[in-house]
Regions:
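C-terminal cap/linker of serine protease catalytic domains
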Residues: 4-6, 15-18, 37, 44-47, ...
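N-terminal activation segment of mature serine protease catalytic domains
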Residues: 34-35, 42-52, 56-134, 263-265
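Intrinsically disordered, low-complexity boundary segments flanking structured domains
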Residues: 84-88, 169-170, 181, 186, ...
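Active-site region of chymotrypsin-like
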Residues: 92-98, 159-166, 193-265
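Conserved beta-strand elements flanking the ATP-binding pocket of the protein kinase catalytic core
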Residues: 101, 144-146, 216
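Conserved active-site neighborhood of the chymotrypsin/trypsin-like protease fold
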Residues: 105-106, 113-185, 189-192, 209-210
Length: 265
């Protein structure tokens, strides 16, 4: 049995350490290229945009100087998101992925019906005094908790309205090791970040009634409630945590969508 961590709680100090480590790596590679007589790779416009975006975010925390180098592999997940978000299908899926806010914290959720049913994690909305969700294009709405399944960390919210964008839920999906999957969420200080991962295997957590799926993927604080999508764009699971698991290292965890189907029958 293993105890999961509710998301990968990447603190500001840990993030800075990660950036500094990658900065030194990038500078070392640059020096090696110069020694070998090679010209360093020129910065692409999209890389410049990413770097300046990150510098702006951390400027108010006095860390902008850390981003005055030409490449930062530590923000690879932003580069991947930019690449994936250029795809029409990913753009469509992102419209149904929302930011769930309780006033004091935030997470991710996604609409599963055009009349405003939203799935998220129970720990995202637990003890919330107020609830709201923000759709990328339709804006902010008040939400009501209508279903709660704390034993598997799932919750369903209701937003008043209609014609909401929604994701399709897979029916009895199969999981194949090393299969590529996609997920969309609001990690760290960002919103609408698309990323990809690789399916690993199932695991049974301590005090959990159902097995959950592990995936090799960059899951961070704020990704709780993110939908995991297969190649067809159907939701096969809901991210809720990370944990360390040998021999994979830190892995993302998601509740298989069939668990939600069974609970809502």
């Amino acid at each position: 049995m293993h105890k999961p961590t509710i998301e990968e709680d990447l603190t500001e100090e840990e993030f800075i350490e990660l950036v500094l480590a990658e900065q030194q790596k990038a500078l070392a590679e640059d020096r090696q290229q110069r020694i070998q007589g090679k010209k360093p790779k020129k910065q692409r416009p999209i890389v410049k945009w990413i770097i300046w975006s990150m510098a702006f975010v951390l400027f108010f925390n006095t860390f902008a100087l850390l981003f005055q180098i030409y490449t930062i592999p530590a923000i690879e997940f932003l580069k991947v998101s930019t690449r994936l978000s250029a795809q029409e299908d990913i753009q469509l899926y992102k419209k149904a992925v929302v930011e769930v806010s309780t006033g004091s914290s935030k997470g991710t959720g996604f609409a599963i019906s055009h009349d405003g049913l939203v799935v998220t994690n129970d720990h995202v909305v637990d003890n919330a005094q107020t609830l709201s969700v923000v759709f990328p294009e339709k804006g902010i709405f008040e939400a009501e908790l209508v279903e709660s399944y704390p034993e598997v960390d799932l919750a369903v919210l209701q937003v008043q309205g209609d014609d909401f964008p929604a994701l399709e839920l897979a029916q009895n999906p199969s999981f194949t090791k090393n299969e590529r999957v996609y997920f969309i969420g609001n990690p760290l200080a960002f919103t609408g970040i698309a990323n990809e991962g690789i399916l690993l295997e199932t695991t049974l957590l301590e005090d959990w009634p159902e097995t959950v799926m592990m995936m090799q993927a960059p899951v961070y604080k704020g990704n709780s409630g993110s939908p995991v999508l297969d190649e067809k764009g159907q939701v096969i699971g809901i991210i809720f945590a990370t944990m360390k698991k040998e021999p994979y290292g830190r892995v993302g965890l998601f509740v298989p969508i069939q668990v939600l189907h069974n609970l809502r029958q």
